[in-house]
Each structure stands twice: as C-alpha cells, then as structure tokens.
Amino acid sequence: MAPKAGKKPAEKKPAEKAPAEEEKVAEKAPAEKKPKAGKKLPKEAVTGGVEKKKKRVKKSTETYKIYIFKVLKQVHPDIGISSKAMGIMNSFINDIFEKLAQEASKLARYNKKPTITSREIQTAVRLVLPGELAKHAVSEGTKAVTKFTSS
C-alpha cells in the first residue's frame, strides 16, 4: 500500500506542472500557426484542379444513332425507338461494318493488292450478307458510288 501512496503524490506533482506546461504550449501555439498560414498549397491544388478540368475534353464517340433515326422516320414516320433499342442497332451496324472490313482486307491480301477498292467491298458484302439482303446491298452500293462519281 505504500507504493500507492507514493504514486498519488507523484501524480499530483505533474498536475501542478501542467499549468506551466500549458503556458509553454500556449507560447508555442503562435509558432505552430506559421505552417497553418502556409496552407496555400491546397489553394494552389484547387486552382490546379480547375486547370485540369479545363484540360478535360469529352471523349467523342461516333455513333450511327442520328442516321438510324433518319432511316426509321423515312420508313415509319409514326414510330419511335427506345434508347436501348438504339444502342442495339448501333452495335449491330458496328459489327456488320467490322465484318465487312475484315473480309475486304482478306480479299485484298489474297490478291496481293495494297488498297481496298469498291470491288473488294462488293465481294465482301456478297460473302458476309445472306441472299436477297446481299443483292439489295450491292445494288444500293453501286447506286451510291455512281452518284458520288457523277457529282
């Protein structure tokens, strides 16, 4: 029990020194405010963030949505299309174009030619698209090419 009594006076002594330490801490507090005054770094970071926002440019994604809508209005003026269906149609057209481009590039390689001409595209259309769809696509394609060359 004697050690307990010894601890109590020891605890009181630091408590008595605490006000003196608080004065020292209070004296040091203005010295610590200097780094607080140096908080210009976050403000600079904010202005740097604003500059980064100015540098950010929307990534332009090319879609066929406008053209799909125009064709829909030509065929069925009274019918609309949902955004989900429009996305499906857009991905469908991208897939078809990719298949046609791959087939046309294969044909150009087989014939050892460095360029893809309208002939390779026409043959690729006949190979990729089935039956009547290929015939209609070829006729529309030749019509578009003749219109382009005549103008």
From Swiss-Prot:
<dbReference type="GO" id="GO:0000786">
    <property type="term" value="C:nucleosome"/>
</dbReference>
<dbReference type="Pfam" id="PF00125">
    <property type="entry name" value="Histone"/>
</dbReference>
<feature type="compositionally biased region" description="Basic and acidic residues">
    <location>
        <begin position="8"/>
        <end position="35"/>
    </location>
</feature>
<feature type="region of interest" description="Disordered">
    <location>
        <begin position="1"/>
        <end position="54"/>
    </location>
</feature>
<keyword id="KW-0488">Methylation</keyword>
<keyword id="KW-0832">Ubl conjugation</keyword>
<feature type="modified residue" description="N6-acetyllysine">
    <location>
        <position position="39"/>
    </location>
</feature>
<keyword id="KW-0238">DNA-binding</keyword>
<feature type="modified residue" description="N6,N6-dimethyllysine">
    <location>
        <position position="13"/>
    </location>
</feature>
<keyword id="KW-0158">Chromosome</keyword>
<keyword id="KW-1017">Isopeptide bond</keyword>
<comment type="similarity">
    <text>Belongs to the histone H2B family.</text>
</comment>
<feature type="modified residue" description="N6-acetyllysine">
    <location>
        <position position="33"/>
    </location>
</feature>
<comment type="subunit">
    <text>The nucleosome is a histone octamer containing two molecules each of H2A, H2B, H3 and H4 assembled in one H3-H4 heterotetramer and two H2A-H2B heterodimers. The octamer wraps approximately 147 bp of DNA.</text>
</comment>
<keyword id="KW-0539">Nucleus</keyword>
<feature type="modified residue" description="N6-acetyllysine">
    <location>
        <position position="7"/>
    </location>
</feature>
<dbReference type="GO" id="GO:0003677">
    <property type="term" value="F:DNA binding"/>
</dbReference>
<dbReference type="GO" id="GO:0005777">
    <property type="term" value="C:peroxisome"/>
</dbReference>
<feature type="modified residue" description="N6-acetyllysine">
    <location>
        <position position="28"/>
    </location>
</feature>
<keyword id="KW-0544">Nucleosome core</keyword>
<dbReference type="InterPro" id="IPR055333">
    <property type="entry name" value="HISTONE_H2B_site"/>
</dbReference>
<feature type="cross-link" description="Glycyl lysine isopeptide (Lys-Gly) (interchain with G-Cter in ubiquitin)">
    <location>
        <position position="147"/>
    </location>
</feature>
<dbReference type="GO" id="GO:0030527">
    <property type="term" value="F:structural constituent of chromatin"/>
</dbReference>
<feature type="modified residue" description="N,N,N-trimethylalanine; alternate">
    <location>
        <position position="2"/>
    </location>
</feature>
<feature type="modified residue" description="N6-acetyllysine">
    <location>
        <position position="12"/>
    </location>
</feature>
<feature type="modified residue" description="N6-acetyllysine">
    <location>
        <position position="40"/>
    </location>
</feature>
<comment type="function">
    <text>Core component of nucleosome. Nucleosomes wrap and compact DNA into chromatin, limiting DNA accessibility to the cellular machineries which require DNA as a template. Histones thereby play a central role in transcription regulation, DNA repair, DNA replication and chromosomal stability. DNA accessibility is regulated via a complex set of post-translational modifications of histones, also called histone code, and nucleosome remodeling.</text>
</comment>
<feature type="modified residue" description="N,N-dimethylalanine; alternate">
    <location>
        <position position="2"/>
    </location>
</feature>
<dbReference type="GO" id="GO:0005634">
    <property type="term" value="C:nucleus"/>
</dbReference>
<feature type="modified residue" description="N6-methyllysine">
    <location>
        <position position="4"/>
    </location>
</feature>
<dbReference type="GO" id="GO:0046982">
    <property type="term" value="F:protein heterodimerization activity"/>
</dbReference>
<feature type="modified residue" description="N-methylalanine; alternate">
    <location>
        <position position="2"/>
    </location>
</feature>
<keyword id="KW-0007">Acetylation</keyword>
<protein>
    <recommendedName>
        <fullName>Histone H2B.3</fullName>
    </recommendedName>
</protein>
<dbReference type="InterPro" id="IPR000558">
    <property type="entry name" value="Histone_H2B"/>
</dbReference>
<dbReference type="InterPro" id="IPR009072">
    <property type="entry name" value="Histone-fold"/>
</dbReference>
<dbReference type="InterPro" id="IPR007125">
    <property type="entry name" value="Histone_H2A/H2B/H3"/>
</dbReference>
